[in-house]
């Protein structure tokens, strides 16, 4: 949504000078296209999506539940509240990040968790999305609520 008034990521043109336009990146869980600059589009034999410099006001459609509802739905698992470091391979989608948060039992916070690592592949993580919360906090040009993911690899004590 590159034309939202007073939004941080709004711009009439991308970094290549191409006019920006609204587009839906994912519909019903299906990827509609990539974020392509003029250069990357040429390399792939595709058309630019006017995204040189990245996305413009990327908004993930919220679900019906707030964070408390997502925790109840999870029942047992890890609520990640902090990610540490930068361990994402953008070519393969593999990631490994330090994390901290809270362990959940019976839909309630049981205890704090720190010095753990979450790892996996972004494709698998995106496929495992169960729900997106309605608790989004604006952060720059991205807007997304809490995300409930079916399963992730966690290491630590």
Protein language model features and the residues they cover:
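Dual-mode signal for accessory low-complexity, basic/Gly-rich regions
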Residues: 1-157
């Amino acid at each position: 949504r590159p034309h939202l008034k007073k939004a941080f990521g709004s711009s009439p043109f991308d970094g290549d000078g191409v006019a920006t336009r609204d587009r839906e990146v994912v519909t019903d869980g299906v990827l509609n296209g990539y974020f392509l600059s003029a250069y990357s589009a040429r390399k792939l034999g595709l058309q630019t999506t006017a995204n040189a410099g990245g996305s413009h006001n990327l908004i993930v459609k919220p679900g019906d539940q707030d964070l408390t509802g997502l925790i109840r739905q999870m029942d047992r698992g890890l609520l990640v509240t902090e990610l540490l470091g930068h361990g994402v391979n953008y070519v393969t989608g593999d990631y490994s990040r330090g994390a901290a948060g809270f362990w959940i039992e019976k839909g309630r916070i049981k205890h704090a968790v720190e010095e753990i690592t979450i790892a996996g592949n972004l494709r698998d993580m995106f496929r495992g999305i169960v729900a997106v919360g309605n608790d989004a906090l604006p952060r720059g040009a991205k807007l997304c609520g809490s995300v409930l993911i079916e399963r992730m690899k966690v290491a630590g004590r």
